[in-house]
Amino acid sequence: MSDIEAQRIAARIDTVLDILVAGDYHSAINNLEILRAELLDQVKDGISPSQAPGSPWEI
């Protein structure tokens, strides 16, 4: 995992944590499911994160 990839994942986790602090548990869980699916797809397809499209985050 590259440093850039790790930073992007950490930033997305921070977003989920912010959503949890705000009390919107449904959106936080949904965002974690989106992140999980994208990570699994990258591993399956062998796509580097820099080539992967952005995700539809809900806040």
From Swiss-Prot:
Domain of life where this protein originates: Bacteria
Pfam families attached to this UniProt entry: YciZ
InterPro entries: UPF0509
Secretion signal, residue range per the UniProt entry: none
Family of this protein: Belongs to the UPF0509 family.
Protein name as it appears in the record: UPF0509 protein YciZ
